[in-house]
Amino acid sequence: MENQYKVELHNVTKEYDLYRSNNDKLKHFFNIGNVDVPRFWSLKGVSLNVKPGEALGIIGINGSGKSTISNIISGIIPQTTGTVDVHGDTSIISIGAGLKWNLTGDENIRLKGLMQGLSIKEIQAVRDDIVDFADIGDFIGQPVKDYSTGMRSRLGFAIAVHINPDIMIIDEALSVGDDTFYQKCVDKIMEFKKQGKTIIFVSHNLRQVELLCDRVAWMHFGDLLEVGETKETVDHYRKFSKDFKAQTAAYRKKYQVGKKKEQADFDIVAYERQLVEEKAKDSDKSKQAVSRQVHRTLYKQILPEKMTIATKLVMLVAIVLFVFFALVNVSGHSVTSAIENPTVLLHPVNHYIKSQSVLFNSK
């Protein structure tokens, strides 16, 4: 049975640990000591669905979580909690996204194509179309690090739209480039819409959103404030922006500081309790059973960020074995002799020379 939605997000959060140093990062990873790490929640429980063939716009002020959502959907970064189900191949288009700067334009085309499952023959078939669309001429043979921002954006867009993804994610990619390239991009996006492709369009440009999108999601400091028909949601966002800009600078500053503090103070445990309370109202199961179900759902796609005791033991054994075999290799002795007499590893060079001398004299 075909999925009702192409993209499904349920109770998705994203936490960033603001490490003060690399030492703190290592201590936290290995779960050593009590490291006080400041945290910031870019997403605070977002649930969102995108239908097949739908163009969904994502709007919001800077820092609202728009790009975080697009990166999670595309698989660039993982969510902290919640479920993300994407039914189809995704291709994200942002300024320079996915391009390897030390590779040439041609090499990037091949790499991106292979990563999307295309054969060399299929990549060669679209190569010229990509170069023509990007309009970068002889620079296609130069390293991407030598490109301008506009050239990188054009190449990234051209590659993404020619590898035929099921879901195209466009993150501010139309903000760079001249009017001619912009129109080519719009025409290509409209062509994708006619083909029934799913599009997620992240932008500050409300006119572009109104032109291209069927529905719009309004993100606001990590929360999904509203999702609905394009005109209605964009009108609400415009009114908010107008009213906000009319406030004094002191008010705007205080408001932003307060919202960012809410993101820093977000309590995932309290959020989970809230979900349990809401679900328990409509369930005939016990609250304890509902709590277990909610917890499983929140964390079933999540890998642990810290090492468990078992993992630490495995790592310790692996390190010991690595050091042991390295010393055996340097000493010139067999593994068996090193196990029977480990002291030979303490002075490997001298012992190895003596053994070679004995061998030479015996001849």
UniProtKB/Swiss-Prot annotation:
Keyword Cell membrane annotated: yes
Catalytic function, reaction form: ATP + H2O + teichoic acidSide 1 = ADP + phosphate + teichoic acidSide 2
Stretch forming the signal peptide: none
Region (Unknown), start-end ranges: 247-363
Subcellular location: Cell membrane
Enzyme Commission number, as recorded: 7.5.2.4
Entry keyword set: ATP-binding, Cell membrane, Membrane, Nucleotide-binding, Translocase, Transport
Residues that coordinate or bind ATP: G60, I61, N62, G63, S64, G65, K66, S67
UniProt-recorded Gene Ontology molecular function terms: ABC-type teichoic acid transporter activity; ATP binding; ATP hydrolysis activity
InterPro entries referenced in this protein's UniProt entry, alphabetically: AAA+_ATPase, ABC_transporter-like_ATP-bd, ABC_transpr_TagH-like, Bact_Polysacc_Export_ATP-bd, P-loop_NTPase
GO CC annotations on file: plasma membrane
Membrane topology value: Peripheral membrane protein
Functional summary from the UniProt entry: Part of the ABC transporter complex TagGH involved in teichoic acids export. Responsible for energy coupling to the transport system.
Family: Belongs to the ABC transporter superfamily. Teichoic acids exporter (TC 3.A.1.104.1) family.
Annotated protein name in UniProt: Teichoic acids export ATP-binding protein TagH
Organism: Lactiplantibacillus plantarum (strain ATCC BAA-793 / NCIMB 8826 / WCFS1)
